[in-house]
C-alpha cells in the first residue's frame, strides 16, 4: 500500500511539473508577444512629397467673375498654322518716323508663325524696312487677349497692342514694346522689361499710365523667369476688365496693372509691328548690320487667343 501511495505521489508530481512547464511556456510566449507589441515602430521620416509643379500655360485667361464665363472670339484667334488669313488680318502700312518704311512683303505666315522681318535698304533715308499686321475685327471690355511671341534681337520695339486708329482721339493699350538688344547703352533692363502702358487721348489731350514689369520677378518655379525676350517664346496678355482697369499678364502670371484717368471705352483693333527710332526711350536706333542677320531680324508670333466675358 505504501508503494502504491508513493507511485501515486510521484505521478501527481510529474503532472504538476508538466503543467507548470506548459504554463511557463505559455507565459513566456505571451510575454514575448506583449514585448513585441510594445516595441515602437521604426521612426522613419516620411519621404517629403515634392510640391506639384505649376503649369503656368494653363493659368490664363484668368478666373472669370462669379456668374460669368469666357468665350473665344474666333475673329481674334489664330494658330498661324496655315496661310495668312485675310478674313482676320490686314497690313496697314502707315509709317513711323524716319528711318521706318512699312512694306507688305516684310510680314507673312510660315512655319507655324506670323512673322515680321526688319531688313535693310541702305540707299534710302527710310532704310529700316519692316511691316505691321492688324485685326479687321475690334473688341471692347470685358475681354482678354494673349499672344505667344519671340522677339527679333535688334534694337527695335517688338509690339503687341490695341488701338482704335485715330491718333488725336484714341484709346491705346500697349501690352508689350519689347527691345531685347538696345543699342543706346542706356536701357539695361530692356531685355526683360515689358513696357506696358495705356494712352487715352481726347482732342490731342493725352492721359497715360505705364507699368514696367520685369520678367525676372516672375515666380521662382516659372520656367521663363529671367529669360530674355529673344531667347524663348513668351506669352503676353491683357485683361481689359472695365472702363478703368487694365491688368497685364506674362507667362501665366499677373504682370502689373494700370488705371485709366478717364473712361476707356472705344472699340479697339489688335496690332503687331516692329519699328525703331533714334531715341533713348526706345533703346536706341537699330544697328544696320543686324538687319542683314537672318538669325535675329525677325519677330515671330506663334499664336493669338482672344476671349470675351459673358453671363453664364
Placement of each model-derived feature along the sequence:
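GH16 jelly-roll
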Residues: 40-312
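Sec-dependent N-terminal signal peptides
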Residues: 6-13
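N-terminal, intrinsically disordered, polar/charged segments of Gram-positive cell-envelope systems
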Residues: 30-41
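Alpha-helical and His/Cys-centered functional microenvironments
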Residues: 7, 34, 204
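Enrichment for repetitive, rod-forming helical segments
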Residues: 9, 26-27
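Positively charged n-region of N-terminal signal peptides that target proteins for export
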Residues: 1-4
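Bacterial lipoprotein signal-peptidase II cleavage site
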Residues: 19-26
Amino acid at each position: 500500500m505504501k508503494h502504491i501511495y508513493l507511485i501515486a505521489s510521484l505521478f501527481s508530481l510529474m503532472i504538476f511539473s508538466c503543467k507548470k512547464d506548459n504554463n511557463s511556456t505559455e507565459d513566456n510566449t505571451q510575454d514575448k508577444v506583449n514585448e513585441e507589441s510594445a516595441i515602437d515602430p521604426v521612426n522613419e521620416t516620411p519621404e517629403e512629397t515634392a510640391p506639384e509643379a505649376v503649369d503656368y500655360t494653363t493659368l490664363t485667361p484668368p478666373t472669370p467673375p462669379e456668374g460669368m464665363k469666357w468665350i473665344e472670339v474666333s475673329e481674334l484667334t489664330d494658330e498661324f498654322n496655315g496661310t495668312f488669313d485675310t478674313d482676320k488680318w490686314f497690313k496697314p502700312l502707315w509709317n513711323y518716323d524716319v528711318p521706318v518704311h512699312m512694306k507688305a512683303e516684310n510680314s507673312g505666315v510660315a512655319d507655324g508663325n506670323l512673322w515680321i522681318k526688319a531688313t535693310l535698304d541702305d540707299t534710302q533715308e527710310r532704310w529700316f524696312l519692316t511691316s505691321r499686321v492688324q485685326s479687321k475685327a475690334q473688341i471692347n471690355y470685358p475681354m482678354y487677349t494673349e499672344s505667344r511671341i519671340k522677339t527679333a534681337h535688334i534694337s527695335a520695339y517688338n509690339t503687341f497692342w490695341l488701338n482704335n486708329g485715330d491718333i488725336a482721339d484714341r484709346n491705346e493699350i500697349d501690352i508689350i514694346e519689347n527691345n531685347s538688344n538696345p543699342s543706346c547703352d542706356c536701357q539695361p533692363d530692356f531685355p526683360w522689361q515689358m513696357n506696358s502702358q495705356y494712352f487715352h487721348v481726347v482732342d490731342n489731350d493725352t492721359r497715360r499710365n505705364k507699368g514696367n514689369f520685369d520678367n525676372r520677378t516672375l515666380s521662382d518655379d516659372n520656367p521663363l523667369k529671367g529669360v530674355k525676350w529673344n531667347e524663348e517664346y513668351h506669352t503676353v496678355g491683357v485683361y481689359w476688365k472695365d472702363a478703368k482697369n487694365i491688368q497685364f499678364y506674362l507667362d501665366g502670371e499677373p504682370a502689373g496693372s494700370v488705371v485709366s484717368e478717364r473712361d476707356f471705352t472705344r472699340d479697339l483693333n489688335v496690332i503687331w509691328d516692329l519699328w525703331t527710332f533714334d531715341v533713348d526711350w526706345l533703346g536706341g536706333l537699330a544697328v544696320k548690320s543686324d538687319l542683314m542677320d537672318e538669325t535675329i531680324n525677325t519677330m515671330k508670333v506663334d499664336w493669338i487667343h482672344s476671349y470675351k466675358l459673358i453671363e453664364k
